[in-house]
Amino acid sequence: MRFIIRTVMLIALVWIGLLLSGYGVLIGSKENAAELGLQCTYLTARGTSTVQYLHTKSGFLGITDCPLLRKSNIVVDNG
């Protein structure tokens, strides 16, 4: 029972941290548009957000992988 309570408390603290900081965590990505685009999906405290990046495997143009963390445009506390 202690394990469950501690797990719930940890999840709540992480969620509050994401809410106040405005960051999202990568939950999925896929290539699109003939492998020239990369669609990244992030989990934020307010839901999910999807971002499109220019993508090449070599990294010469655009990015090779989605960033693990991404700052959201909507932040609860800007103070």
Swiss-Prot record:
Cross-referenced InterPro entries, in alphabetical order? YobH
Record keywords, A-Z? Signal
- What Pfam family does this protein match (any one)? YobH
Could you tell me the superkingdom of the organism this chain comes from? Bacteria
- Region forming the signal peptide: 1-33
**What is the designated name of this protein?**
Uncharacterized protein YobH
Task: Please give the organism.
Answer: Escherichia coli O157:H7
